[in-house]
Structures are given as C-alpha cells and as structure tokens.
Design a protein with these regions (language model features):
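Bacterial N-terminal signal peptides
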Residues: 12-25
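Short loop/turn segments that connect beta-strands within beta-propeller blades
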Residues: 83-86, 141-144, 235-238, 290-294, ...
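A short helix->beta-strand "capping" segment at the edge of beta-propeller domains
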Residues: 33-58, 108-110, 238-246
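Serine-hydrolase catalytic core recognition
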Residues: 198-199, 260-261, 269, 275, ...
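Bacterial N-terminal signal peptides that target proteins for export
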Residues: 2-15
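Non-catalytic accessory segments flanking enzyme active sites
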Residues: 58-62, 67-69, 73-78, 88-111, ...
C-alpha cells in the first residue's frame, strides 16, 4: 500500500493566496537577519495596524423569519433589523459554545486528504455502510457484519474498487468514489485499472535514520492513463452491474469516456449520471445510465475545438426533477440554458456577451432565475440579474459601477447587497427585488486608515501582448510613499489558466503590509485570467508559459512611465503555478525582472499529470514546440538576475524531478542561484521571512542589475 503524505496544502488555489494577497507573517527566525535589514522596523510597526485599518461595512447579515428580519454582529454585539419598520434592535449575546459537535463518518465533515477520497459512505437511511479497504469494496449491514462486494482488487494486479487514482482526486475533484442512491437500494462505485500507468517513486522520511518510499501510479503528459469503470451494486440481489461508460476502447484518446467523473444519482434514483470527456478534453458529454441494465445515453454534449471544454458545468435541478439549468460556454461566454432530462433544450435563459458567474436562486413560484454576471463597468464587477424561466425580461438589478455580493431573502422580496470597488470599501444595503434602495445598513469606517496615512490601491490598465486585449493591474503603495523617490517592485503571481486572482474580481483591500519594507506591490492579469470569455482563454491553448508570461511582461513595461518605479529592481514570486510563472518571467525576460522566488514549480510540462497538462497543452508527441517553449530549461542560458528555488522533498503533486532537472540545467549553463528545501514537506511554499531577506538583499541592499527597457 502506498504511504499517504500528510501536511499538504488542501487545494491548488490555497497555494496561491499568499502570492495573490502579498501578506506575510512576521519573521519566525531565519537567523534573525531580517531584523537587521532595511524596512523591518517599519514593517513590524505597521503590519497589524494595516490589517485592522478598516472597519468593514460588510455586515455578513443573515436572513431570519422568512425574510422579515436580518441578524448581524457589529463590534461583538448582535442586532436584529426589522425590514418592515427599518429599525435595528440589540439582541442578547449568544451563550458560549461548549464542546464540539459529533463529526460524521469519512472525515467528520472535512475534506479527504489531497488527491484522495473518503473511504466510507453511509446509505441515506443509515442502514448500510460501503467502505474501501485493501483495494476492494466492502458492505456492512444493519447486523454489523461486513461482506466483500468485490474480491479481485489487489496491489499485484493494480486493480482497486471504491477509490480513485490520485489524478482523479487532484484534477477532477473526486472526493468520493462510492455513491449511494437516494433510496438506499443501490450503491455505485469506481473500478480503476492502473496497470498501464507508470509508477513514481517518492522518497519520504528523509530526516529520519532510514527513509521510506511512496509509490504512486502517476500518469504524466503523454503516458497511458488508468482505465476507469463504474459498477452499480443492488443491495437486495447482491449483484453488481457494469455501466457502459465509454464510446469505444478505453485506451483510445478519441474515446469519449476516457475520463469519467462527477458521478451522482438523479433525485428519483432512476439513473446514475456523470460527465465524461475524451482525452483531449475538448468534448464533454453529460451522460445518464440505467442502473439495472448498464445502458447509457448522452443527455447533452459540449464541444470546443479551439481549446478545452469546462469539465464540470453548473447544473441545477428544478423542483420537478425533470428540468435543469445548465451552464455552457458554447457561445464563447458562459450562459445559462434550460433543459429537460431527455436532453431537449427548452430555452436559452441568457445570451450575453459577458460571463454569468453563479446562480443565486431559482424562484419557480415567481417564474424567475436570480443569478450573478460580469456585466459591470468591467468584467471584474459582478452584478445581480433576474430573468424569467422563459428566457425573457432579463434585467440587471445592481449598480454596474460596483462589485456586488448579494443574499436574497427567503420570501424573495428583498436582498442584501454588499457593494465595493478597488478603492471604495464595502457598503451593506437593503434593496427590494426590483433593485430599489430600501435602506443603507452599514458603511465602512476609514478613520484609522486615513490616520495611518495609508494609500488606497490603484487600478491601472494595459494592453496584452496581442495589442488589443485590455488587462488590469493593481498597485499597492507603502504608507511612507514619496513620488519623488524610486521604489523596487514585487509582483506576486499565480497565473494559471482561469485561476483565482485578485484581478478577476474588483474588491477593496488594504495595502499589502509587505509594502512597508519599502516595496511597491503590483498584481497583474493576463489572458489566462478568468472572466473575459472563452475566446480570450483560447490564446493560451497549447502555449502555457508563453502567452500569459508575455502579457505580464507588458504589465511590467506599462509601469515604466511612472517616475517612482525603478524598472531595474523588479522581483516576482509565487508557489505552484506561481512558482512556474516566477521562474519563467526571470528566465524569459532578463531585461524586465531582476529577481524571482519560485516555490514548488512545474519546470517542464512533460513532468506534470495528464489531466491538467493535456487539457491546456495536449500531448508532447503532437505539441513538441509548445512543450519546448513552455519549459524553463529552454531559457537557462538567459539567466542574469537572482533566482531562489524552493521545493518540498515529499511533494507528490509537483514532483521534485521538476526542480532537479532545472538545477541540473542551470549548473550545466554555469549559472548561480539559491535553493531552499522543505525536508519531508509536500506541495508548499518557501519560508516567507527568508523570501523577504532574498528580495531585500537583491533589490534593495545590493540590487541585481538588469538592462532597463
């Protein structure tokens, strides 16, 4: 059995948070050198003050009494706001909580370990429990006796049931591989055949007297994937039926059903439904299967020949469980459609030249859909819309000058709106469902912010490398900012396709405390940033490491006209995809970037998993030019600035082989660089104090020279 690695970051996007926000903890050691460096005292003085500088006007109000009132807390005191009288009254304090609640099976309500699945699943009526053990599926009945549902799962034959391959958990968000029917009469489960998949051997426990090895069937770009099947077990007959989950032979790349995921039952338990794609992931079929016979039908099909399809679109059932709302990018922008379960399109609910961004509520009694969309003054400002379930009378209900987050009342008569922009802090308001203002409930208090002399974050625009796509950046200034001086710049990055970014939604935040070291912090977007439509994302298809880096380079160039920016002192940092972006920016643009800290980066996409990599790059055999252009090793001879590399020795996501090949290439090219290693650490980032030492040393105390543009 493979040894599971603990202590890993729970999700890829979590690794991007420090990079996106630019917030670091105070020094926790690092030989205390940071204490002696320029800016340290100012940072220590301002760090906590900045993070508490604004009393937010976001009440985080909760609807009660079916929409007649709101409850919220201000300064530790609870209040009830009466919608009819428009008056607030203080409520008694809640009694202190004692003890913790009982956790449920299979993780106590938490997520399974990264890339893994829950090992148990209890039937809805709580009579039975299906569980994964020793590569087989077991069933425990009401008498407590366990019997095997499968028996041929084995490590020797590389067959397993009731669990999934690592790549399915990591890239397709499969946190379970066992699915009970709502009526508790049947249970569906995965079967994985990993025989064709090469193993990766990861050395663990390297700080101990003797190390151990974790063996994982890990398919890398271009190599065979595991073969997946789904079976349905009938509790009464104790027999399993194999579903016809694919259109052809499992090893054929063109077969739709190469990947099978997002498995669930219809509400009436009449069919098991799932999504399936071809290996290239430019065709996705929403599929329904009869659990008694295993026969399957395609409910609807999505194709996007110039890129990849969204592999898990929004799907919301209506109350009759026969109609559902479906999100599709088929027009080039994400829109909503109403279907019946036979696959018949009833109507397009929206047809916008901008992205829909989430369903708030389906009000069938009123015959309307409330949803969010990127229809503000720019794509980063989400708005509340209402449209009839017949696709008519679409209306925006919020002010397009702001970004909105809304909570609709249970009775559908009002909604709470939290409105903000990058330079206007949150205000909470009560509006009726026509969008008419009823009352302003709270405004942010900026008194402390102003007393501290803090500067609001500035938004700027620049053109992408194509010369026409409008992109946005955010600039964070130190409280001591003097426009007559020149400042070094730090650029926190993530940069992956459609990944989380603070330039994807325009919200208010205080300046990054890191600025107090004497830096200006700049966040950049690219055509990989979500929210601009599918055709914009198409620009990066088969070109990871090229287009998004070119766009960020244009953002750095756009700052050159500002006299207080020192273009010879620009640093970039990030983790995971952000680590890849950091290394590539330094290597590809030595005339723009003087220093980079790259944590846990992919360095060549041939070394990463099939599902993620091939979605954007296809296979190396048919896109050699793209893989070569996206490899950090291609550019090592261009290294001029300072490079800090970090990796965890127990990283089972982005394997240490990525870093080893980059280090080897740098050494062969005669290049100098620094390394930091996380012994027995998984997919993680560098010690933040050490990273700040690196940037202060190389951009302030002895700045690396670059040829300015």
């Amino acid at each position: 059995m493979s040894k599971r690695i603990t202590g890993r970051v729970p999700a890829r996007l979590a690794l991007a948070l420090v990079a996106i926000l630019g917030v670091f903890p105070a020094s926790s050691g690092a030989q205390d050198r940071l204490r002696t460096m320029p800016g340290y005292d100012q940072y220590q003085k301002m760090n906590t003050l900045i993070q508490s500088a604004v009393r937010s006007g976001d009440l985080r109000a909760t609807w009660v009494e079916n929409g007649k009132a709101l409850e919220y807390t201000i300064d530790g005191k609870r209040y009830r706001y009466d919608v009819a009288t428009r008056k607030a009254s203080e409520l008694p304090a809640l009694p202190p909580q004692t003890g913790g609640g009982r956790g449920g099976r299979g993780g106590g309500g938490g997520a399974p370990e990264r890339g893994r699945q829950f090992a148990q699943a209890q039937s809805p009526d709580k009579t039975f429990e299906a569980s994964y053990r020793d590569r087989n599926l077991w069933m425990k009945g009401p008498d407590g006796v366990e019997t095997p549902i499968t028996t041929d799962g084995s490590e020797k034959d590389r067959i397993k049931y009731g669990t999934a391959s690592w790549v399915y958990g990591e890239e397709l968000d499969q946190t379970t591989a066992i699915w009970w029917a709502p009526n508790s009469r049947k249970v569906a489960y995965y079967r994985f055949d990993e025989k064709p998949v090469p193993d990766y051997f990861l050395q663990l426990d390297q700080t101990k007297l003797y190390s151990t090895v974790d063996t994982e069937a890990y398919p890398k770009a271009g190599v065979p994937n595991p073969v997946v099947d789904i079976f349905v077990y009938d509790v009464a007959s104790k027999q399993s039926v194999k579903l016809d989950v694919r259109t052809g032979k499992p090893f054929e790349n063109s077969v739709v059903g190469h990947y099978v995921y997002n498995v669930r039952w219809t509400p009436d338990a009449s069919e098991l439904i799932f999504n399936r794609t071809n290996r290239r992931q430019n065709i996705m079929e929403f599929t329904a299967c009869k659990p008694d016979t295993g026969t399957c039908r395609v409910v609807l099909r999505e194709e996007w020949p110039t890129g990849w399809v969204e592999n898990n679109p929004t799907m919301v059932y209506l109350k009759d469980n026969k109609r559902f709302i479906w999100a599709s990018e088929r027009t080039g922008f994400n829109n909503y459609y109403l279907y019946d379960i036979s696959g018949k399109l009833i109507t397009a609910l929206t047809n916008h030249p901008f992205e829909v961004a989430g369903i708030i509520r389906v009000d069938e009694a009123a015959g309307v859909l409330y949803y969010m969309a990127r229809s503000g003054d720019n794509y980063m400002k989400t708005q509340l819309h209402r449209v009839g379930l017949d696709g008519k009378n679409d209306r925006r209900l919020t002010d397009p000058a702001f970004t909105h987050a809304v909570t609709l009342a249970p009775d559908g008569k009002h909604f709470v709106d939290v409105a903000q922009t990058h330079d206007q802090p949150p205000t909470t308001r009560l509006l009726d469902v026509t969008g008419k203002l009823v009352a302003e409930l709270a405004k942010s208090d900026m008194t402390k912010f102003e007393q501290l002399g803090l500067k609001k974050i500035e938004m700027f625009t620049y053109n992408a490398a194509d010369g026409k796509t409008k992109l946005h950046g955010m600039i964070s200034y130190p409280s001591t900012f003097d426009p007559s001086k020149k400042y070094p710049v730090l650029v926190p990055v993530y940069g992956g396709p459609a990944s989380a970014s603070n330039t994807a939604r325009e919200t208010f935040s205080v300046p990054s405390p890191t600025t107090e070291y004497g830096f200006i912090i700049v966040n950049l977007s690219s055509r990989a940033t979500p929210g601009m439509g599918k055709r914009t994302l198409d620009a990066i298809y088969e070109k990871l490491g090229q287009v998004e880096m070119d766009d960020m380079a244009e953002g750095i160039k756009a700052l050159s006209s500002r006299l207080y920016i020192d273009p010879s002192r620009v640093g970039v940092y990030g983790t995971s995809y952000g680590g890849y972006t950091s290394a590539m920016m330094l290597l590809r643009f030595p005339e723009l970037v003087a220093a980079a800290s790259a944590s846990s980066p992919v360095t060549d996409w041939r070394h990463y998993d099939t599902i993620y990599t091939e979605r954007y790059m296809w296979i190396p055999e048919e896109n050699k030019e793209g893989y070569d252009a996206g490899s950090a090793m291609t550019y090592v001879a261009k290294l001029k600035g300072r490079l800090m590399l970090y990796w965890g020795t127990a990283d089972n996501n982005v394997h240490p082989s990525n870093m080893m090949q980059l280090i080897q290439a740098l050494q062969r090219a005669g290049k100098s660089f620094e390394t930091q290693v996380g012994p027995d650490q998984g997919h993680s980032g560098i010690n933040q104090a050490r990273m700040m030492e690196f940037f202060i040393e190389n951009l302030v105390m002895r700045p690396a020279a670059v040829t300015t543009f």
